[in-house]
Amino acid sequence: MEHKDIPDAQLHQIKGAASASSGQVPIATGSGTTVFGFLDWTQVANKPTSSGYQAKLSAFSSVNQNPSAVDTPLQITFGSAQTTADVSISAAGVITFNTSGNYLIDIFLRFGRSTSAGNAILLNRILKNGAQILNSNGVILSAATQTIPFSAAIPLTMAAGDTITMEVARDSAGTNDGGLFVVSPTIAGWNIVPSATVVVNKFVDGA
């Protein structure tokens, strides 16, 4: 009878199986024998990988950002300077890409106004290497102490050395009021609501 034809009930178990614990597997020793043990992740030679976006930098501003006058853009800042291998940001809000690739830029802005009568028209835009990309974004605030949050996820292909900046402006068709506002919770243990936040993600191919 060939070995392949032996019924399962008559087959011998692998040597060492009788004393192995539940969940242990046979592991080759490299010397022609096997032992039973729990497989450690470090022992896996061909580990599975995954592709997708990974966060490379996150920054936010904890101060209000108000243009000085109508039709006078203000460059948006995101707190202190930071540097990573793939991307860096200056205290002036200039995002510099240190490596080329496909990026996803998440931005969160909180438009607001505090005083004055009439409608306040607030605009913002994104610039790549100093030139505007995409359409402008805007809100009209008709009441004092009004705030409106805005967020967007923007996919961009960037080369090493490319920069991204953002601006906010008060349009002269409206009143000279408003900008990006911070909200400070009075509830103990709650973090502030920043005036502006940016998260830079890079696509990583795990293949």
Task: Show which residues each predicted segment covers.
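Extracellular jelly-roll beta-sandwich "head" domains, especially the C-terminal globular C1q domain
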Residues: 52-207
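Small-residue hinge/turn detector
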Residues: 25-28
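Disulfide-braced loops of extracellular cysteine-rich modules
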Residues: 11-22
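Short acidic, low-complexity intrinsically disordered linear motifs used
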Residues: 38-47
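Short, disulfide-bonded extracellular cysteine-rich repeat modules
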Residues: 33-37
